């Protein structure tokens, strides 16, 4: 028997990511599922834990970690609520603004609580971001193409934005392409972050994919990561749940918990 299991609340348990995460937690010997947050009328399985409609109903729940796999419009409020009530948020929802992330980090320090916002929980995607940060030192001309299922609400993806932010730390911002470049269709060249172009693709059949394409005189370099199903995110989610128990402030990016 394993003592001191980490007690986890899952918000957004009815989504594809959420339902996969619930099964991972139920099967993990060191985790204990203690509550679910979502619409009760959507519950079709028999769960042995309480299901709540509103986060306020969880104020007195005994838990360690709040796993949030909801939607961009509620994830910030959920993470703040978790910290406010002594739970460590592990958030896989993307779409946070820089200001929202900064406010949550500040609040977590005040509460001395660990936490994690991860643009991507797939370990390969985290490595892709780190490899891109290294490559851009030598290939400063770069564009990002991110591809996701057509149910994804935010664009560009949090992974693409995080990748660009990391590369911007090593790359001088500059215009990429012809100086007199003109778009015959608005948006044809994609979004711009620090002079880097980001292109978003949304199609049925996809899960989560990203290419970082570097170009230089006479050569090119392409880095790519593919998540073929949502099981690819479970190792990172489990790692995040364990690691937030060991820190006293919220971290932005799973790389903070890897030996990179």
From Swiss-Prot:
Is Oxidoreductase tagged as a keyword?
yes
According to its UniProt record, where is this protein mainly located? cytoplasm
Instruction: Please name the CDD domains in this protein's record.
Output: DHDPR_N (cd02274)
A Gene Ontology cellular component where this protein is annotated is: cytosol
List positions binding NAD(+). Answer: 12-17, 92-94, 118-121
Q: Is Membrane tagged as a keyword?
A: no
Q: Which residues cross the membrane?
A: none
Which pathway features in its UniProt record?
Amino-acid biosynthesis; L-lysine biosynthesis via DAP pathway; (S)-tetrahydrodipicolinate from L-aspartate: step 4/4
S-S pairs = none
Q: Per the UniProt record, which EC number(s) apply here?
A: 1.17.1.8
Quote the catalytic activity from the record.
(S)-2,3,4,5-tetrahydrodipicolinate + NAD(+) + H2O = (2S,4S)-4-hydroxy-2,3,4,5-tetrahydrodipicolinate + NADH + H(+); (S)-2,3,4,5-tetrahydrodipicolinate + NADP(+) + H2O = (2S,4S)-4-hydroxy-2,3,4,5-tetrahydrodipicolinate + NADPH + H(+)
Q: Where in the cell is it found?
A: Cytoplasm
| Gene Ontology BP term (one) | diaminopimelate biosynthetic process
Q: Which residues form the active site?
A: 148 (proton donor/acceptor), 152 (proton donor)
Which family is it part of? Belongs to the DapB family.
Function statement: Catalyzes the conversion of 4-hydroxy-tetrahydrodipicolinate (HTPA) to tetrahydrodipicolinate.
Q: Which named protein is this?
A: 4-hydroxy-tetrahydrodipicolinate reductase
Whose protein is this, by species? Lactococcus lactis subsp. cremoris (strain SK11)
């Amino acid at each position: 028997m394993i003592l001191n299991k980490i007690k986890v609340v899952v918000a957004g348990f009815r989504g594809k990511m959420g339902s996969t995460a619930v099964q991972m937690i139920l099967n993990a010997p060191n985790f204990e599922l203690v509550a679910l947050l979502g619409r009760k009328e959507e519950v079709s399985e028999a769960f042995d834990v309480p299901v709540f409609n509103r986060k306020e109903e969880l104020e007195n729940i005994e838990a360690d970690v709040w796993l949030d796999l909801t939607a961009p419009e509620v994830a910030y409020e959920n993470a703040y609520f978790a910290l406010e009530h002594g739970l460590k948020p592990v958030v896989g929802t993307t779409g946070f603004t820089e200001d929202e992330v900064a406010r949550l980090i500040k609040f977590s320090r005040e509460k001395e609580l660990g936490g994690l916002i991860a643009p991507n929980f797939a370990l390969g995607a985290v490595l892709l971001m780190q490899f891109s940060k290294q490559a851009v030192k030598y290939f400063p001309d770069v564009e990002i193409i991110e591809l996701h299922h057509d149910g994804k609400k935010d664009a560009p993806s949090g992974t693409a934005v995080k990748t660009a932010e990391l590369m911007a730390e090593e790359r001088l911002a500059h215009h990429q392409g012809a100086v007199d470049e003109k778009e015959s269709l608005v948006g044809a060249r994609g979004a711009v972050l620090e002079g880097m172009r980001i292109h978003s693709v949304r199609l049925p059949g996809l899960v989560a994919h990203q290419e970082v394409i570097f170009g230089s005189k006479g050569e090119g370099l392409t880095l790519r990561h593919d998540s073929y199903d949502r099981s690819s995110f479970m190792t990172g989610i489990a790692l995040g749940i364990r690691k937030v128990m060991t820190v006293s402030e919220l971290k932005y990016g799973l790389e903070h918990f890897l030996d990179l």
